Structure formats: C-alpha cells, structure tokens
Amino acid sequence: MTEQIYVGNAAADAPAGRGWLLGHFQPDGDPRHSDDVEIKWAIHPPDDRRAQWVTGEQRSAALILISGRFRVELPGRSVLLAEQGDYVVFHGVSHSWHAEEASVVVAVRWPSLAGYALSPSDNGTSAVS
C-alpha cells in the first residue's frame, strides 16, 4: 500500500521543488501529488521581484504573508501584505510581485496545471507564481 501520510518541514523541503510543496509536479503515489491544488513556501530576500507579469492566467491563487513586507501588483491595483496573516486572493488575474523586505509567503493555487513555469532567469530568485 502506498503511504498516504507525509510529514515534513516547509523550509527544509521547499528548495528541492523551487518552493513548491504540493501539486501535480510531485511524483504519482506521493501524498504531496495533487492535480487540484498547489502549495508553495516562498522565501524572498529583500528587493526580490518578478517584474515580468504572469499573463494568460487561468488559475486562482491565495498569497498569505508569514513574515516581511510583500507587494502584489494586479491590473489597476497594488496590494501590500505588511502584517503577519495578511492575504490576497485573485482568480485568473495577471500579476507580478516585489518583496519590499525579506519575506516568507505561502502561495496556494488551484487547479494544479502543468505549463505555467517561468525560467528562473525570467522569474527572479524565488518565484511565487
């Protein structure tokens, strides 16, 4: 029987998957494999940014600030996550982001779809989306 429980530490596990802990990209049979949702533990140094906007977005996302100061740029709106627990939810919206201070952010996206990854050179040092 395939193990249905996985116990880990987000900070320790995140580097192996560019921050992504759960999603379609985890191996079949791994309890962290899901076609329904993706979860990322993103650690951003100060001034980390993705200036390139995600375009053609069809997924939904929730970004939750654990620590730091993190700005999400959305069409016609800039959202600052400044206090622990601040979050933003958006559906099918193009976006970019900027870590104004060293920040830790949890990103939840749904559904988990292949084909959205940007190369690290296009994506800053640690992409949220």
Residue ranges and their predicted role:
Residues R32-H33, R50-E57, L74, L80, ...:
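Short histidine-centered beta-strand/loop micro-motifs
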Residues Q58-R71, P75:
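Glycine- and acidic-residue-biased ligand/ion/polar-headgroup-sensing regions
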Residues R69, S94-S96, V104:
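Structural motif
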Residues M1-P46, R50-W53, D122-S129:
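A short, N-terminal "cap"/entry segment at the start of jelly-roll beta-barrel domains
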Residues G76-S94:
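Short acidic-glycine-tyrosine-enriched beta hairpin
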Residues I5-Y6, H98-S129:
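Double-stranded beta-helix
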